[in-house]
Structure formats: structure tokens, C-alpha cells
Regions:
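Bacterial N-terminal signal peptides that target proteins for export
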Residues: 1-8
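Bacterial N-terminal signal peptides
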Residues: 8-16
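Alpha-helical structural elements
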Residues: 11, 27, 35, 150-152, ...
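Sec/Tat signal peptide C-region and signal peptidase I cleavage site
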Residues: 19-23
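Acidic, serine/threonine-rich low-complexity disordered tracts
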Residues: 24-125, 169-266
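Active-site/ligand-binding surface loops and adjacent short beta/alpha elements
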Residues: 126-185
């Protein structure tokens, strides 16, 4: 083959390969910084029953991860009182992301009901795609351990929260979606980030916030079956503070409502 033609084809290959493989999923972070600390009141909802359930927190710190600067985001959910006696939730979720908000490591230690599980997902970025090593231990027994390769940007539970805080919703209308990939257990699934419009939300710090309403829906590979995963109310400003976060459990949902926030970026 003519050398000039070969070089031209290589150029096209580099330019037009999927963004997930070559662009490596880099995002400019404009919404949070080292030292952000948000505390929440938790509410358990099952059917028509809603009860105060405990406390939660979302903390962000800048740390050293394998010799490089990284964001460490830690979410704690701890139920107590009557709701806690009905269905216990004591979860610790930790995510490490590089300075471009690419997930590096995610761990979840969860006591939910009478069960204990531990999940670990580690991400590596190579020329031929993204490798995700994932494993889960459930009640002391290993359920799976495998490595998945993908060419699209893929997020865990906490890095997806960092993602939606930095998306631009300016030109979106209610019903609009952004499609991403999400790691769920041993599978990479399709996820839609749904824009549901604007709303005023009163938080437990006594303030009323203008918020952007977001929900995230997980689809199967054929986009036929779906389930709601997370929904959030984010402040309609540069900080995109999660004022309310709804997380779906095996039974019911846990709602986190902002109680206090400090260390804001903007």
C-alpha cells in the first residue's frame, strides 16, 4: 500500500475512533473541590409510609492515588430508629477519580437488611479501551470476579454523581436524555440521564433552592426493560449541590435531604 495512503488511513483512525476509547472520558470539573462536606437527613419510603431514618454524608477530598492527585468521594448512609429496625441500611461507598473525573476505584460495603455485601470495581485506561475489574462478596461468599472491557465511558455509583454535577443542562428540555454506560455488578449497562426540568426545593437547612431535576434509568442491552436507579435535585448554579438524592433499595427507597453544606467551590 502506498505509504501516503497508509498514513492518511491511520490519521482517520485516530480522529474518528469513539470518544470513549481515544478521548478517554475526560471532564472539566467546575462544581466541587477538595474539602466539600455535605450532611443529610435520611428518610425511608415504602409505599405510602415515610419515616425519618437516620443520617448520611457526602465528603470530597483531594488525595494521592498511586502517585497521582485524585478526588476521593465518600458517601455514608446510616439508618437508625424505627425505620432502621424495619430495614437496616449501613452503607459506605467510596470512589476515587482522577482530576478529569475518570473513575479509578469504587468500593461499596453494604449492610442492608440482614445481608452484608462488598463490591470492588477498579478501572484502567489503555489504548484499546477501558478495563473494569469487578468482584462481589455476598454474606461471606464470592459471587463473581471478572474483567470487562469496553470502548465507552463507564461510571460507578459515585462517579456518575460527579458526572451529572458537571453536565450542561442549559439547552435541555424536560424529557431530554444523555446516554452513558454504568457498571452494575458484573455487567456494563446502558443508563439514561433524564432531565426533568426545574423546581424549588426546601432543604433541611431551612433554605429553599432552585434545582435541576435529574433521574437516572438503567436499561438492558436491548433498551426494552428498565429500572429507576437514582434521582437527584441539584442546585441550579455552578456548584450543582445535590439537595435531594433518592436511592432505590430492594424494598422502598432512601431519600437523603441536605441538612448542612460547607467547603463549596463557587
Amino acid at each position: 500500500m502506498n505509504k501516503t495512503i497508509l498514513l492518511f488511513l491511520l490519521f482517520l483512525l485516530v480522529v474518528f475512533l469513539p470518544q470513549g476509547a481515544i478521548g478517554q472520558c475526560k471532564i472539566i470539573n467546575n462544581s466541587f473541590k477538595d474539602g466539600e462536606n455535605i450532611t443529610y437527613d435520611l428518610y425511608f419510603n415504602y409505599g405510602i409510609v415515610t419515616a425519618k431514618a437516620g443520617t448520611g454524608s457526602l465528603k470530597t477530598n483531594l488525595v494521592n492515588y498511586k502517585g497521582n492527585s485524585a478526588f476521593n468521594i465518600r458517601m455514608l448512609l446510616n439508618t437508625s430508629g424505627l425505620a432502621g429496625s424495619v430495614y437496616t441500611v449501613n452503607d459506605t461507598l467510596v470512589s476515587y477519580m482522577d482530576m478529569n473525573l475518570r473513575p479509578l476505584l469504587f468500593t461499596k460495603n453494604a449492610f442492608e437488611g440482614k445481608d452484608y455485601s462488598r463490591e470492588v470495581q477498579s478501572f484502567s485506561y489503555v489504548e484499546d479501551g477501558i478495563k473494569v475489574r469487578t468482584n462481589r462478596v455476598f454474606n461471606g461468599k464470592k459471587k463473581f470476579e471478572e474483567t470487562i472491557t469496553t470502548h465507552e465511558c463507564t461510571y460507578d455509583y459515585l462517579s456518575v454523581l460527579a458526572l451529572i454535577r458537571n453536565l450542561d443542562y442549559t439547552d435541555m428540555e424536560p424529557g431530554d436524555q444523555k446516554q452513558i454506560q454504568f457498571i452494575s455488578g458484573r455487567e456494563i449497562v446502558n443508563m439514561a440521564v433524564n432531565y426533568n426540568g426545574l423546581s424549588k426545593i426546601k432543604a433541611n437547612d431551612g433554605q429553599t433552592y432552585n434545582t435541576v431535576q435529574i433521574s437516572m434509568t438503567i436499561y438492558d442491552k436491548a433498551f426494552k426493560d428498565k429500572k429507576e436507579a437514582i434521582s437527584a435535585s441539584l442546585t441550579d448554579d455552578a456548584n450543582r449541590i445535590p439537595i435531594v438524592i433518592d436511592t432505590h433499595l430492594k424494598i422502598g427507597t432512601i431519600r437523603a435531604v441536605l441538612k448542612n453544606v460547607s467547603g463549596l467551590r463557587n
